[in-house]
Amino acid sequence: MNNLEKTYKTELVNQLQQQLGFSSIMQVPKLTKIVVNMGVGDAIRDNKFLESALNELHLITGQKPVATKAKNAISTYKLRAGQLIGCKVTLRNKKMWSFLEKLIYIALPRVRDFRGLSLRSFDGKGNYTIGIKEQIIFPEIVYDDIKRIRGFDITIVTSTNKDSEALALLRALKMPFVKE
């Protein structure tokens, strides 16, 4: 069991239950999954960009990514419907907890000029999305081996439908939010 997961199950569940005023432990919000998505617009011209993105996402998450296809054709970008244009990974259980711990304690402190995560990135349904500008903040990525610095999105999906409860959960997990 991961340190962050152990802390959540032993200490944070009871704290959140009291803080949010729930009568049952089952009402306490929990992490459902983490989705890591990388759009590769350069894959229209050359498939090697997509292959390197798939490899980098595999190194970062420890799980094989799935290539995503374009839904619609856009003639100005020379994009056809069904063309491979990105990749994504859905993390659950142990890999989700280890990725979140790595994100909070290793990757985010390595971001240049990091002042905290924005509180505006909640979607109104209890999910939080982080935009990462460079994949080199993760220790698995060797700077000399990458062909291009590329960003990606990390969506943290919780079991609650309220942003305030999701914020309380993520704050309890020590997510570095901007000071209000």
Curated annotation (Swiss-Prot):
One of its GO terms (molecular function) is rRNA binding. Disulfide bonds: none annotated. The keyword Ribosomal protein applies. It holds the Pfam family Ribosomal_L5_C. The keyword NADP does not apply. GO terms for biological process: translation. Keywords: Ribonucleoprotein, Ribosomal protein, RNA-binding, rRNA-binding, tRNA-binding. GO terms for cellular component: cytosolic large ribosomal subunit. This is one of the proteins that bind and probably mediate the attachment of the 5S RNA into the large ribosomal subunit, where it forms part of the central protuberance. In the 70S ribosome it contacts protein S13 of the 30S subunit (bridge B1b), connecting the 2 subunits; this bridge is implicated in subunit movement. Contacts the P site tRNA; the 5S rRNA and some of its associated proteins might help stabilize positioning of ribosome-bound tRNAs. Gene3D superfamilies: 3.30.1440.10. It comes from the Bacteria. SUPFAM superfamilies: RL5-like. HAMAP family: Ribosomal_uL5_B. Part of the 50S ribosomal subunit; part of the 5S rRNA/L5/L18/L25 subcomplex. Contacts the 5S rRNA and the P site tRNA. Forms a bridge to the 30S subunit in the 70S ribosome. Belongs to the universal ribosomal protein uL5 family. This is Large ribosomal subunit protein uL5.
